Swiss-Prot record:
SMART domains: ZnF_C3H1
UniProtKB keywords: Metal-binding, mRNA processing, Nucleus, Repeat, RNA-binding, Zinc, Zinc-finger
GO molecular function annotations of the record: RNA binding; zinc ion binding
InterPro entries xrefs: CPSF4/Yth1, Znf_CCCH, Znf_CCCH_sf
Protein name per its UniProtKB record: mRNA 3'-end-processing protein YTH1
GO biological process, one term: mRNA processing
Amino acid sequence: MGSVVHPDTEKYPFKFEPFLRQEYSFALDPDRPVCEDFNYKIGPSSCPNGVFCPKKHVLGIFQNKIVCKHWLRGLCKKNDNCEYLHEYNLRKMPECVFYAKNGFCTQSPECQYLHIDPLSKVPPCEDYEMGFCPKGSACEKRHIKKVLCQRYINGFCPLGRRECDMEHPFFYIPDLSSPLRIKKDEEINTRKRDEENERRLNAIINGEI
């Protein structure tokens, strides 16, 4: 009776099983070790066993990818041909759609998906990094406050901008090649009169006068 409920299929191999393993990765352990000889830049020829290698050949399209959401549920049918990772890596998990939409997650802290801070998606303000942003708090970009490097302010930082943990501000040097133009009083008064006439005309149109 036990042989009927739990049959031993290894005793009856089929001739087409090697073809299924080669083309569709059939009956291969998904947790099998990664082949150390395989180089995705060269291809299957880099491995002595080629396409018949019992170990996993990680292709180039799988490098630095996110985890397959279908694989997490056991529903992925692509096996090794899937363009997403088939491994549990918290840093490469897909983004939680519920958290991205609502700002909180009902499954937290047990949620398997990645919770990304919405502010991290906002690009930094170039004007603020230069030293001053005219929009202030109304700026749609992110103002990142950093501690100024005193060595850089004094004249030289041996670590440089990339290695130093503190801020190296950009100093904006105005273009002095073009001559400065000073407006005359007549131009200023003419502009004021035009603005006053425009306000008076709008008041007449709106029936305020």
